[in-house]
Design a protein with these regions (language model features):
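Conserved beta-strand/loop scaffold segments within soluble protein domains that form the structured core
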Residues: 1-137, 141-144, 158, 162-202
Length: 202
């Protein structure tokens, strides 16, 4: 009752990654925010599963998951919001947005609502697409090289998640790691045996 919980997951590397979140708002006037950012390339796969259970009235939840997929990487988002019959006055929102940098990158998004109360405000949605061509053209027309323009748009896309992190030193560190990852400067897992799609290796 009267509790507030925030959960964040930032996935920068990993051959096969599964992030599971099981949340139950088990009292009145509870609030939860669950955020996710995932960056994948080569043959990496990132799977996010979120189950949000609203069991009592006057609770609020927000899910925001965003991903950037490159090369032949794949991603999945399966998010479920359950609003029980007694959970009147619930507010629950869920969004999954993705940028696919190649035609071979794939994303499966499945946002779900299961509502048994009639006095609620809930929404869900998902998008997958390429970088905005108009924004790219604008940045290029201002003299930015293609790679820098692409990087700027990807960073702005990711910032919506990073900007919600409440702990400032952690937020700054995540900003730094994400920028390095997008620039290709963050080293991969040197001791991983999966090789994540290196030529000639599976």
């Amino acid at each position: 009752r009267d509790s507030n919980v925030s959960a964040n997951t930032i996935t920068l590397h990993g051959g096969l990654v599964r992030n599971n979140f099981f949340m139950r708002l088990n009292g009145e006037n509870c609030e939860n925010q669950t955020l996710g950012l995932y960056l994948a390339d080569r043959s990496q796969h990132v799977d996010n599963y979120v189950h949000m259970d609203h069991a009592y009235p006057n609770s609020r939840s927000n899910q925001l998951f965003k991903g950037v997929l490159d090369d032949i990487s794949t991603g999945a988002f399966n998010g479920r919001i359950l609003v029980r019959q007694d959970a009147q006055k619930t507010e629950a929102y869920q969004s999954n947005n993705n940028i696919l940098l190649t035609n071979d990158a794939k994303m499966n998004s499945k946002p779900q609502l299961e509502i048994y109360a009639d006095d609620v405000s809930c929404s869900h949605g998902g998008t997958s697409g390429q970088l905005n061509e108009d924004a790219m053209f604008y940045l290029r027309s201002r003299g930015l090289p293609h790679k820098e323009a692409q990087l700027l748009l990807m960073y702005a896309f990711a910032h919506e998640v990073i900007g919600e992190i409440k702990i400032e030193p952690l937020k700054d560190r995540i900003h730094e790691l994400v920028e390095k990852r997008l620039r290709g400067e963050l080293s991969r897992c040197n001791y991983c045996e999966m090789h994540c799609g290196e030529p000639g290796k599976n």
